[in-house]
């Protein structure tokens, strides 16, 4: 083999590897978008049953085609407090089993038969068809879900084409003595493990490194004696991704990464010790035979399943070993309940955008709940003042401010990721609405301060003023609850109730102020009380305006329209029957006595 041919083979091998990795990444991204964060949600809600944890870890990894992605997610779950370390152990073991599905798919490249039906199972036969379907889905179908499915098909086709390129590039190497001698050196268990670990650590994908090994096997120059230790090393090397992810994380997250490493290290030691002892006594007939892609898949699966069966009963021991390695320190900061609440905005989840969007929704719901509670706690202080209530409102408003800051920053980072059309809509709605939630909590503080002023000055509203405020407060509670439900469910039909109700609240606010002026003329009220009443009604009116913003935002984003003022002008200047009907219902429901 001349230098020119060798150089061409190396370039083809590198090019094939590049296509292989790109295809795997494209397929993984497509699968993640199609799942819409549901797989990660399943992991998040798993029970403490270790067998169920293993099965879930295997299932999720088999679908997303990456044990590294699963373990990084697990590190993120543990770091955010969503998952306990004890739960993580089973998922990590399952992830190792789930990743073997890729090697079984890639083993199809080794099919050798003249039978037409069997030939159709060979990836080179059906990959072009998948590529054509994928292109049609992406270019000619205007549906984001179909486009994501198209990405999966094209990713798979590119992956298989890359695998075929690698196989073609290494086939001539079988005739090069130096190459075959190099592979034989990996029959030394230690060298084989190191080689497999280094290769996987560099490309950070055990599936890809196993694929490379399967491509090399097609030369017929890789004996099982070399393939077995390389596979063991590949399982160890894949731990680097979780270890890197755990840098800067909390202790338990680092322990989760340590569990992954210990599982593969201990599993490798046990498997290789038993295997080589039996081989020394019995002598496996296949040991010095040329490995095949299917043989690689079998070894990969047998190792991971066997290691899980052996070590699952000792899951607590792995957990303790990780805790002994990464010890608690006296000076370790205890995480407060509030800080734990914000851990759902885990930076590691940004690598799984669909799940990060779902976590952002959860945070936005909690933010909305806090602003809702702050508002109606503040309103209750007008009639029944308490210092405890004041403190609660201040704490809730402070938490809402923090949500706006941290969630807003998180959403901006998330907006730079590749997300589906549906998630993009959700992201836009959240970015628009968190400002309204924050302003509602600010109005809650203003109402609380008005209640404080009433209490400190020994003032009380008249019974008529109280009744007026009660009706206005009920209308505002109705619009706030409706707006928050519209935000949560993105319910376009329910959003139609908001604008008529907002108009009624404007009418009520004006009427409450007019009635106060009348009472002032009759000597039933004071100017000072009037200022406080006006402040409270104005705040409630502003709250209704923010609810209107939320309703309009949900409607506009879902219709791909972003001109809020034009939308409101059209709704109010050209109201339809639904608007009139809702308006009359609200007027009847909220009447001042």
Regions found by a protein language model. Give the residues of each.
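Conserved small/polar residues in nucleotide/adenosyl-binding loops
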Residues: 1-5
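Membrane-embedded alpha-helical segments and adjacent helix-loop junctions characteristic
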Residues: 15-73, 114-120, 143, 147-218
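Membrane-interfacial helix-loop connectors
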Residues: 73-95, 103-125, 163, 200-237, ...
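Cytosolic, long alpha-helical scaffolding segments
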Residues: 83, 109, 222, 248-254, ...
């Amino acid at each position: 083999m001349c230098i020119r041919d060798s150089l061409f083979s190396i370039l083809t091998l590198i090019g094939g590897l590049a296509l292989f990795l790109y295809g795997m990444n494209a397929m993984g991204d497509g699968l993640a978008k199609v799942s819409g964060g549901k797989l990660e949600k399943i992991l998040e809600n798993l029970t403490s049953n270790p067998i169920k944890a293993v099965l879930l870890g295997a299932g999720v990894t088999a679908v997303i085609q990456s044990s590294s992605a699963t373990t990084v997610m697990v590190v993120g779950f543990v770091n955010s407090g969503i998952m306990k370390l004890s739960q993580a152990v089973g998922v990590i073991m399952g992830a190792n089993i789930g990743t073997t599905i890729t090697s079984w798919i890639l083993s199809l490249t080794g099919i050798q038969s003249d039978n037409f039906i069997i030939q159709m199972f060979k990836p080179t036969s059906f990959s072009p068809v998948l590529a054509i379907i994928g292109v049609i889905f992406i270019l000619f179908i205007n549906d984001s879900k179909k486009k994501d499915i198209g990405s999966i098909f094209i990713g798979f086709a590119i992956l298989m084409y890359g695998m075929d390129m690698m196989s073609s590039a290494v086939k001539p190497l079988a005739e090069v003595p130096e190459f075959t001698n190099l592979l034989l050196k990996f029959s030394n268990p230690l060298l084989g493990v190191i080689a497999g670990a280094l290769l996987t650590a560099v490309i950070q994908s055990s599936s890809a490194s196993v694929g490379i090994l399967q491509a090399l096997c097609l030369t017929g120059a890789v004996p099982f004696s070399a393939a077995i230790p390389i596979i063991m090393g590949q399982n160890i090397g894949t731990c680097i991704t979780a270890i890197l992810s755990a840098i800067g994380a909390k202790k338990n997250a680092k322990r989760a990464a340590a569990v992954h490493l210990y599982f593969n290290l201990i599993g490798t030691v046990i498997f290789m010790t038993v295997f080589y002892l039996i081989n020394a006594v019995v002598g496996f007939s296949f040991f010095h035979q040329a490995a095949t892609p299917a043989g690689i898949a079998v070894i990969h699966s047998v190792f991971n399943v066997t290691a899980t069966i052996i070590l699952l009963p000792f899951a607590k021991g792995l957990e303790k070993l990780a805790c002994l390695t990464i010890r608690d320190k006296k000076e370790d900061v205890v995480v407060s309940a509030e800080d734990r609440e914000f851990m759902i905005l885990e930076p590691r989840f940004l690598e799984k955008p669909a799940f990060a969007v779902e976590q952002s929704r959860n945070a936005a719901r909690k933010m909305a709940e806090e602003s809702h509670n702050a508002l109606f706690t503040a309103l209750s202080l007008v009639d029944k003042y308490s210092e405890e209530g004041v403190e609660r409102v201040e704490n809730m408003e402070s938490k809402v401010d923090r949500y706006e800051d941290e969630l807003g920053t998180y959403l901006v980072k998330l907006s730079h990721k590749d997300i589906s059309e549906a998630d993009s809509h959700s992201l836009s709605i959240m970015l628009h609405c968190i400002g309204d939630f924050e302003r509602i909590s600010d109005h809650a503080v203003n109402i609380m301060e008005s209640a404080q002023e009433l209490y400190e000055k020994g003032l009380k509203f008249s019974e008529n003023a109280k009744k007026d405020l009660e009706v206005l407060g009920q209308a505002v509670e109705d619009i706030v609850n409706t707006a928050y439900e519209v935000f949560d469910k993105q319910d376009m039909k329910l959003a139609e109730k908001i604008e008529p109700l907002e108009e009624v609240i404007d009418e009520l606010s004006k009427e409450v102020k007019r009635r106060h002026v009348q009472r002032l003329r009759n000597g039933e009220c004071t100017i000072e009380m009037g200022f406080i009443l006006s402040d409270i009604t104005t705040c409630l009116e502003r709250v209704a305006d923010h609810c209107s913003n939320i309703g309009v935002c949900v409607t506009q984003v879902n219709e791909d329209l972003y001109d809020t003022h034009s939308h409101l002008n059209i709704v109010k200047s050209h109201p339809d029957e639904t608007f009139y009907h809702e308006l009359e219902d609200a007027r009847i429901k909220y009447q001042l006595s």
